[in-house]
């Protein structure tokens, strides 16, 4: 059976369009009608620069990996027509050594929605109808707010970062960079028992959102003195670096106490002068955090059950046919945190 769909496609720098496509449904997997999707930083990079890092757009590609929808057809008796689902954008191979160890985010042959890492590119979820693996569909109650449920993927990233830090109950936590992911980390660590949460950012608007999401103290490093948090080899048990900026990396290392944990979430470039002696001398455990594994299901559960409320981060919603306008607004960080497309 052939299904016609309308898709949000990027073909290069500042070159996007909503185009009609045809997909073949052969009763394998699950056919989903996409209802809503959040615009991520990678979508913006593909639009603004025609690439993410070294991954350049070489052919038209459907954007988007933060999507939810309703089941149209499925090869599984566990999914029924009309079932509301969040779609996990990860499609690991299932048989490499990392998949076998249940570290699927490290899969050596990962296919991730809306990624130009491979060629042919992997189409994303910004399309009216999408055929996916049944295992990628995570059901949630129909009564749940779809604006909330569309935060499942970024919340999964935040929960995974929180898990990378280890035990958080009673810990003092510092978060540098409170864009959407940083703000969701605030909520995640608070849910997991952090006793004190301090957020740092140079944007007053971002700091205000961090406060709404559960931060106790707000700091602007350009204006506020942080020496008292750096004294005696640092104050915080755990720090999260979420901006990727070198000065933020340095600050996190300075305010993290000896034998504390720093989780690197922000994606930045190489640092010419990384403070190696601070890391070594204070015996800080530096841990990377990349995407998620089982945390996607956790995120769906948290959102469906009202464990956290991400809606303060929702700045605007657009019909998917206004794709370029939505991308332009989402790229204006003086106004936008999270922008969603409605299908």
UniProtKB/Swiss-Prot annotation:
SUPFAM superfamilies from the entry?
A: GroES-like (SSF50129), NAD(P)-binding Rossmann-fold domains (SSF51735)
Which annotated residues bind Zn(2+) 1?
A: 40, 65, 153
Keywords of this protein's UniProt record, alphabetized? Gluconate utilization, Metal-binding, NADP, Oxidoreductase, Zinc
Pathway info: Carbohydrate acid metabolism; L-idonate degradation
This enzyme's EC code(s): 1.1.1.264
Top-level lineage group: Bacteria
Please write the reaction equations for the catalytic activity of this protein: L-idonate + NADP(+) = 5-dehydro-D-gluconate + NADPH + H(+); L-idonate + NAD(+) = 5-dehydro-D-gluconate + NADH + H(+)
Record-annotated residues binding Zn(2+) 2? 93, 96, 99, 107
Cofactor comment: Binds 2 Zn(2+) ions per subunit.
Please report which protein family the annotation says this sequence is part of. Belongs to the zinc-containing alcohol dehydrogenase family.
Known function:
Catalyzes the NADH/NADPH-dependent oxidation of L-idonate to 5-ketogluconate (5KG).
This protein's name = L-idonate 5-dehydrogenase (NAD(P)(+))
Q: Which gene encodes it?
A: idnD
């Amino acid at each position: 059976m052939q299904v016609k769909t309308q898709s949000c496609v990027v073909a290069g720098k500042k070159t996007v369009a909503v185009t009609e496509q045809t997909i073949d449904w052969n009763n394998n997997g699950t056919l989903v009608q996409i209802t809503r999707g959040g615009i991520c930083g990678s979508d913006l990079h593909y639009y603004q620069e025609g690439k993410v890092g070294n991954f350049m757009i070489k052919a038209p590609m459907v954007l988007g990996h933060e999507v939810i929808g309703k089941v149209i057809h499925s090869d599984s008796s566990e999914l029924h027509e009309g079932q509301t689902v969040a779609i996990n954008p990860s499609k690991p191979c299932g048989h490499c050594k990392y998949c076998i160890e249940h570290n699927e985010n490290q899969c050596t042959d990962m296919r991730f929605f809306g990624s130009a890492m491979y060629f042919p590119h992997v189409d994303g979820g910004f399309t009216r109808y999408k055929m996916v693996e049944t295992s990628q569909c995570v059901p949630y109650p129909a009564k749940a707010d779809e604006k909330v449920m569309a935060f499942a993927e970024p919340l999964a990233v935040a929960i995974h970062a929180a898990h990378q830090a280890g035990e958080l109950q009673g810990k003092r936590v510092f978060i540098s960079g409170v864009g959407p992911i940083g703000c969701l980390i605030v909520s995640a660590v608070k849910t997991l028992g952090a006793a004190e949460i301090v957020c740092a950012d140079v944007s007053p608007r971002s700091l205000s959102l961090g406060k709404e999401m559960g931060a106790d103290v707000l700091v602007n490093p350009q204006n506020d003195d942080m020496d008292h948090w750096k004294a005696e080899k640092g104050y915080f048990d755990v720090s999260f670096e979420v901006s990727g900026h070198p000065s933020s990396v340095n600050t996190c290392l300075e305010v993290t106490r000896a034998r504390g944990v720093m989780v690197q979430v922000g994606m930045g470039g190489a640092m010419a002068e990384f403070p190696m002696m601070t890391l070594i001398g204070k015996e800080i455990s530096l841990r990377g955090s990349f995407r998620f594994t089982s945390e996607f299901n956790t995120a769906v559960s948290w959102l469906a059950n009202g464990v956290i409320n991400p809606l303060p981060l929702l700045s605007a919603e657009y019909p998917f046919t206004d794709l370029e306008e939505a991308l332009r607004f989402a790229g204006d960080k003086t106004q936008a945190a999270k922008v969603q497309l409605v299908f």
